[in-house]
């Protein structure tokens, strides 16, 4: 059975349209990797088609919030130096750095989240569901659903893009790969926040970054 979540995942991984993704998954009997192959054969999977190509060029860029309270360093790679100088790519890098400043991701993708952290989160979510009086037979489904939300909060590629929340960072990345015509890889980032770890008044940094973007 092909679910909406499967269609969404395939779309995020390939950049193909919703209907094309649904057709490919149906044809592949729900096999994600086979569906990607089908889309590639049809020339519809721009991001997946380029994903295996080495991206060793690119840039390291920085974003400093206006008053110096937040700083981000990010490395994003392309296949060629020519693409790295592309204005659309440069704008993308700046946007990603701003997004990181505002949304505080901890990892690039869910593959980077340590297994022990995932297990600990599952234990917490399971305890929460049981404390809510939910029947044990549906607790595991609830845990899986809430775990997806957890990934969306801490993984950069799964977060709603700060400047256009209707798309994820992964979808934005897929769009740029299709436009620029090269593989693009968000390799690593580090986010600094002044006074981090020191008890202080809570600030809405996402709101402040958006004000600066729109200002």
Swiss-Prot record:
Location of region: Involved in Mg(2+) ion dislocation from EF-Tu: 80-83
One MF annotation (Gene Ontology) recorded for this entry: translation elongation factor activity
PROSITE patterns: EF_TS_1
InterPro entries cross-referenced by the UniProt entry: EF-Ts_dimer_sf, Transl_elong_EFTs/EF1B, Transl_elong_EFTs/EF1B_dimer, Transl_elong_Ts_CS, UBA-like_sf
Keywords assigned: Cytoplasm, Elongation factor, Protein biosynthesis
Stored NCBIfam families: tsf (TIGR00116)
Family, similarity comment: Belongs to the EF-Ts family.
Name by which UniProt lists this protein: Elongation factor Ts
UniProt organism field: Acetivibrio thermocellus (strain ATCC 27405 / DSM 1237 / JCM 9322 / NBRC 103400 / NCIMB 10682 / NRRL B-4536 / VPI 7372) (Clostridium thermocellum)
Organism classification: Bacteria, Bacillati, Bacillota, Clostridia, Eubacteriales
């Amino acid at each position: 059975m092909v679910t909406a979540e499967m269609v969404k995942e395939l779309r995020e991984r390939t950049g193909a349209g919703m209907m094309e993704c649904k057709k490919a998954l149906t044809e592949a009997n729900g096999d994600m990797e086979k569906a990607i192959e089908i889309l590639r054969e049809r020339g519809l999977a721009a991001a997946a088609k380029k994903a295996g190509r080495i991206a060793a060029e690119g840039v390291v860029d920085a974003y400093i919030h206006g008053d110096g309270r937040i700083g981000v360093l990010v490395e994003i790679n392309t296949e060629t130096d020519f693409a790295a100088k592309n204005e659309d790519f440069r704008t993308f890098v700046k946007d990603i750095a701003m997004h990181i400043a505002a949304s505080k991701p901890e990892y690039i993708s869910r593959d980077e989240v340590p297994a022990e952290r995932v297990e600990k989160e599952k234990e917490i979510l399971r305890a929460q569901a049981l404390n809510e009086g939910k029947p044990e037979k549906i607790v595991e489904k609830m845990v899986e659903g809430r775990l997806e939300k957890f990934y969306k909060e801490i993984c950069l590629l799964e977060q709603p893009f700060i400047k256009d929340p209707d798309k994820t960072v992964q979808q934005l990345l897929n769009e740029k790969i299709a436009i620029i015509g090269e593989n693009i890889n968000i390799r690593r980032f580090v986010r600094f926040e002044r006074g981090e770890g020191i008890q202080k008044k809570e600030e809405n940094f996402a709101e402040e970054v958006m004000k600066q973007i729109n200002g």
